[in-house]
């Protein structure tokens, strides 16, 4: 299963989703994408050499879909062997292990210290140069891009 993430003025990122290792995360992401939840939202947190984060309906990292899902990672008792390598997509969360909702991040560089702490659920297969371009945008002191990086749409191919 594939997610096609179209970013206004940047291009397309294709992600191969992994429902075998993160079925709850994949099902949630697919459901939100198919109902158009992500359309028009932004990548609100960008840290070059680390990751790009999006999927917040408030655009500031404090919003979500109105519910939370179980965190699928080893620190939360779930066997998810997916690593946080360059191009990995993973669910963002607060301190609570089961606090992920709609926000996700895509790794700009390998970050093994996130393994087992966050629910990785797929890998970029095309468009890593788009991730690189977004990771290079100018940001403010809160890691928010000075110019909005807008998700036009996320389409799912099954």
Label each residue range with its predicted role.
Residues 1-158:
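Cyclophilin-like peptidyl-prolyl cis-trans isomerases
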């Amino acid at each position: 299963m594939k997610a096609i993430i179209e970013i206004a003025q940047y291009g397309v990122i294709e992600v191969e989703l992994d429902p075998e290792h993160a079925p709850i995360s994949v099902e949630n992401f697919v459901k939100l994408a198919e109902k158009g939840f992500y359309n028009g939202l932004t990548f609100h947190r960008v840290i070059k050499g680390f990751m790009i984060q999006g999927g917040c309906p408030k655009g500031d990292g404090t919003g979500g879909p109105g519910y939370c899902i179980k965190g699928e990672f080893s620190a939360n008792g779930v066997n998810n062997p997916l690593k946080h390598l360059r191009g990995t997509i993973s669910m963002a969360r607060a301190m609570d292990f089961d606090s992920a909702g709609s926000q996700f991040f895509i790794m700009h560089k390998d970050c093994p210290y996130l393994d087992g702490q966050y629910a990785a659920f797929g890998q970029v297969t095309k468009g890593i140069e788009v991730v690189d371009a977004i990771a290079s945008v100018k940001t403010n002191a809160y890691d928010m891009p000075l110019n909005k990086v807008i998700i036009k749409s996320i389409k799912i191919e099954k």
